[in-house]
Regions:
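Short glycine-rich, acidic/polar surface loops and turns
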Residues: 296-299
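Beta-rich carbohydrate-recognition and catalytic domains
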Residues: 2-100, 109-181, 186-240, 246-292, ...
Length: 375
């Protein structure tokens, strides 16, 4: 039976075909010397057979403040070489420097201008108070552009162009002191959309972590919030850092950090604006649990025939380590992979049959502590 158009979320799901019982990149890896707290988030792209990883390195104290954005490459997904530091934060902890902490490097190729763009988050940082979470606040999304044209310019160097999204008079009511905590652009026809996130970190405990959409006619912007659609109803409590992949039938899948234990979340869309209720994909089972907490996916890499590599970050499991009063685990962050397949049900089951307990809006799963965030 031929597929004549995009399938609904009820007709497809991700299946893990192979798990790995250890991380592919950790503080023990060659090239990670001096990285105190490990790795978190970012994006992986595959270019001419080479995997390029742009990730956040939590190199020193203050935790989640003194950061490097780094570029790594691999030929086989398992063995990695550090190419260099793309950006480094100041580590200022007074609340005055708007680039005190840098997070979430997202490389995106602009075919129209034939250049790689790098989007990343810059935060102010200060000690928390009993009422506010200030470790990362007033996030602003920066756009940088490779100075080298063409696909081979992915390694940069990158020139900062300016801020494309931040909290201000045009913010939606659900956005808060955290500012803009993530940004991922993807193209739909002649228009660009971007997932972006925020939370009201001005009041503890933090009740919701949400995402919305922004739109632009060019990757460089200007970007405008899709206020009538926001916040998106993919998750009811917690969603961060969605990364979008276009599927072969023209539809879209987003993978993201969710509150479910040992899992990441994912959602489908036929048009890039209307997204299905979240489903969960367990990436750690049985003896393959190396992380005490699965955190942020770094995207899906299309390996052909509806198979993908899913990269994700997690806090390594270390005996005797526990979360602090804010739900933060200080064990080093590492990066892992699973092989996945997109299962397409052409007969079309009902929504409840297809999603079932995989709907991450269902009750249960890990609780979302006051500061259980994934920058």
């Amino acid at each position: 039976m031929a597929v004549t158009g995009p399938l609904t979320a009820a007709q497809q799901e991700l299946i893990v075909t192979k798990g790995y019982d250890r991380p592919i990149l950790s503080v023990r890896s060659a090239g990670a010397e001096g990285n105190k707290y490990g790795f978190e988030g970012g994006r992986v792209v595959k270019l001419n057979g080479t995997y390029h990883m742009f990730t956040s390195e939590m190199v020193a104290d203050p935790h989640w403040v003194k950061m490097k954005l780094a570029h790594w490459t691999s030929q086989d997904r398992i063995h990695w070489q550090r190419i260099g530091t793309v950006r480094e934060s100041s580590g200022d902890f007074t609340g005055r420097d708007p680039r005190a902490a840098l997070w979430s490097p997202m490389p995106v190729f602009d075919e129209k201008n034939n250049r790689w763009n790098l989007f990343y988050v810059a935060y102010q940082a200060a000690p928390d108070t009993p009422r506010e979470w200030l470790t990362n606040h007033e996030g602003r999304i920066w756009r940088a552009e490779s100075t080298i044209a063409g696909a081979d310019g992915i390694a940069g160097p990158y020139r900062d162009v300016g801020v494309v999204l931040e909290r201000g008079p045009d913010s939606d009511p659900w956005e808060g002191l955290q500012g803009t905590d993530s940004f991922f652009p993807f193209q739909v026809g002649d228009r660009w959309y971007a997932f972006y996130g925020s939370a009201r970190t001005e009041k503890l405990p933090i009740a919701l972590w949400q995402v919305g959409l922004a739109e632009a006619f060019a990757l460089a912007g200007p970007w405008k919030r899709c206020t009538k659609l926001n916040p998106l109803g993919i998750e009811s409590r917690f969603i961060e850092n969605p990364i979008v992949t276009k599927l072969r039938d023209g539809s879209y899948i987003a993978v993201y950090d969710s509150h479910q234990p040992d899992a990441i979340g994912y959602s489908f869309s036929a048009d890039g604006t209307r997204w299905s209720a979240g489903q969960k994909l367990e990436v750690q089972t049985g003896k393959g649990i190396w992380a005490s907490e699965v955190r942020t996916p770094l995207g899906l890499i299309d390996e052909g025939n509806d198979t993908f590599t899913l990269f994700y970050s997690g806090n390594e499991k270390i005996a005797g380590e526990h979360a602090d009063a804010n739900g933060i685990v200080l064990t080093p962050g590492a990066l892992g992979i699973v092989d996945v397949r997109l299962e397409r049900d052409r007969a079309g089951r009902s929504n409840s049959e297809a999603i079932g307990s995989g709907n991450s809006k269902a009750s249960g799963g890990r609780s979302v502590p006051a500061l259980n965030r994934n920058p």
